Amino acid sequence: MRALGIDPGTATMGWGIVEFNNGHLRLIDVGALTTPAGMPHPERLLQLYNGLRAIIERLRPDTAAVEELFFGKNVNTALTVGQARGVALLALAQAGIPVHEYKPLAVKQAVAGYGGADKRQMQEMVRLTLGLATIPRPDDAADALAIAICHAYTAPTLQRFGLS
């Protein structure tokens, strides 16, 4: 199974693909799509959409995972992240890729074994889990890999119980 994890954002959308076979995880590719701060918002969303479509076409994931939107105190940030998330969901749906959504707590528990793990602990667990020499950068790319790892660990159970 080739799983694409996406950490949505308008300035930076992290993405990472892992392959999960016979209980073993392997990094396929990781990166981030970025948009310039001065670019009009609709153009930023279009650039993210086109970039994600290119990644999907090039790397051919079987499945995808996106973190559920967390509503913090900053409503404007939540709205723009929600729009970037919508762009990602659209690109995945158009490509016919099944999408699964995970709460931040579930991602932390799956990757670090602890729902209270901080960002640094999560990044280190991503590095260790995939056998990488360094933590993937930017942070959004490491976050996307954590989401992909969470899905790779969770998907077999979902399939076994007919929930995928």
UniProtKB/Swiss-Prot annotation:
One of its GO terms (cellular component) is Holliday junction resolvase complex. The gene is ruvC. Mg(2+) 2 binds at residue 67. The RuvA-RuvB-RuvC complex processes Holliday junction (HJ) DNA during genetic recombination and DNA repair. Endonuclease that resolves HJ intermediates. Cleaves cruciform DNA by making single-stranded nicks across the HJ at symmetrical positions within the homologous arms, yielding a 5'-phosphate and a 3'-hydroxyl group; requires a central core of homology in the junction. The consensus cleavage sequence is 5'-(A/T)TT(C/G)-3'. Cleavage occurs on the 3'-side of the TT dinucleotide at the point of strand exchange. PROSITE patterns: RUVC. Keywords: Cytoplasm, DNA damage, DNA recombination, DNA repair, DNA-binding, Endonuclease, Hydrolase, Magnesium, Metal-binding, Nuclease. Its EC number is 3.1.21.10. The active site is at residues 7, 67, 140. It is an enzyme of class 3 (hydrolase). GO terms for molecular function: crossover junction DNA endonuclease activity; DNA binding; magnesium ion binding. This is Crossover junction endodeoxyribonuclease RuvC. It is found in: Cytoplasm. PANTHER family: CROSSOVER JUNCTION ENDODEOXYRIBONUCLEASE RUVC (PTHR30194:SF3). The keyword Nuclease applies. It comes from Chloroflexus aurantiacus (strain ATCC 29366 / DSM 635 / J-10-fl). Homodimer which binds Holliday junction (HJ) DNA. The HJ becomes 2-fold symmetrical on binding to RuvC with unstacked arms; it has a different conformation from HJ DNA in complex with RuvA. In the full resolvosome a probable DNA-RuvA(4)-RuvB(12)-RuvC(2) complex forms which resolves the HJ. It catalyses: Endonucleolytic cleavage at a junction such as a reciprocal single-stranded crossover between two homologous DNA duplexes (Holliday junction). Belongs to the RuvC family. One of its GO terms (biological process) is DNA recombination. Its cofactor is Mg(2+). Mg(2+) 1 binds at residues 7, 140. Binds 2 Mg(2+) ion per subunit. NCBIfam families: PRK00039.2-1, ruvC. InterPro entries: RNaseH-like_sf, RNaseH_sf, X-over_junc_endoDNase_Mg_BS, X-over_junc_endoDNase_RuvC. Its main location: cytoplasm.
